Amino acid sequence: MAIDVVALRSRFPSLAHGFAFFDGPGGTQTPAPVAEAIARTMTGPLSNRGTVSVSERNAERTVAEFRAAYADLLGVPASGVVHGRSATQLTYDFSRHLAKTWRAGDEIVLSRLDHDANVRPWIQAAQRAGVAVRWIEIDPATAGLDLDSYERALSPRTRLVAVTAASNVLGSLPPVRLIADRAHEVGALVHVDGVHYAAHRLVDVPALGADLFVCSPYKFLGPHCGVLAGSPDLLGTLAPDKLVPSADTVPERFEFGTLPYEVLAGATAAVDFLAAMDPDGEEGHDGADAAGPAGLRESAGQGVPGVSRRERLRRSLRSLHAHETALRARTEDGLRALGDAVTVHSKAPERTPTLLMTLEGRDAREAQAHLAARGVVAPAGSFYAHEVFAALKLPDPSLRVGLAPYNDAEDVDRLLDGLSSFLRTAV
């Protein structure tokens, strides 16, 4: 069954303003149940975590529900789920934690395909520790990773391989499991940036071979925060700098200060919203907890009796993949019809519905402004993909078009019409 996009779109208040949003890779729009979960948490009885008062128990439950939701989303134990302000902050934190175990003469391997948040923290940690940095290069022909360069970069001295699961500008999906297996053969840990990947694919951290995996709920309908998933055993070997009275258990030892309970509640609601997009999951459901015309359930833990949240997520993301793939094909067909004036740099065989393009002889920021005047939001820039732009010699800015669950065919047609009219304007 296909996702009911009309019903789905009705759950996003911002869409009522008439905009067509193609900036999902930078952050998605927020569905009402997520905003409502945040508001309920902030306006209900709430204290620091504890077990005595109702307000303390509310905070404790909010944290437990958050960890359970992201355990289901990422395929990991709840005790391996760490909250952070952002994926960038978490990567910086864990670069410092891991670098304590490095020694001069060690090496790490990074990827040119990555967002700078999975590059700069490791380079800076390596510089402080006297560790050498090796690179997996980009294959210009495929916009994917050159695995021969990876083989050359690996050595018995490699301590860490950091790689993206999906490029945030090109959409390319590198073979993470293959990369991880080779890293493990030489005794290295693998840190995977899944920020873009988690918005478009069901994540299975163990199946990817990742020792550490980061993602950002605001890229898949949630609030602004970051999540790290890791093996509790591995996390137990890491010793962050922390306050003496603060918890030394895993994963709490990595979370500094009072947690933002309202953000955790919103992040949990985002996972439940994703799980409820599955049309097949409505079978046998009595509808008693349906919310609005979409039948999308608002409350944590509600779902089809006998069907786990992980299974509902699998079904939903399978349907979402089909929906976004069809829209990507419609977009690509329309861009080809515009002729040689548009060059699409996203060309890997396996990729997300994210397209990076340049317009012959035109400034991408002018195109962005032209589209914005027509209610179409498509940003121009380099999107923190510093190594990608340098390796492929891409113009900065370039135009990025990213699809999200709430996009529909009318959005795509508005985008294509806007680009066509821009290309017809005088230079």
Each language-model region and where it sits:
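Pyridoxal 5′-phosphate
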Residues: 1-427
